[in-house]
UniProtKB/Swiss-Prot annotation:
Keywords of the record: Metal-binding, Metal-thiolate cluster
Role this protein plays: Metallothioneins have a high content of cysteine residues that bind various heavy metals.
Name of the protein described by the UniProt record: Metallothionein-like protein LSC54
Gene Ontology molecular-function annotations: metal ion binding
Organism (species): Brassica napus
Family that this chain belongs to: Belongs to the metallothionein superfamily. Type 15 family.
Length: 45
């Protein structure tokens, strides 16, 4: 099941691929996806 979120963005929707810098999550910021989701991962819920 989905956990907290992916460090990704304002234009990011659940299911979209989160693309951000290693330590700077500025590309996007509210992808609702699993707690195991890392920046750059694809969010699926």
């Amino acid at each position: 099941m989905a956990g907290s979120n992916c460090g990704c963005g304002s234009g990011c929707k659940c299911g979209d691929s989160c693309s951000c810098e290693k330590n700077y999550n500025t590309e996007c910021d509210s992808c609702s996806c699993g707690s195991n989701c890392s920046c750059g991962d694809s969010c699926s819920c």
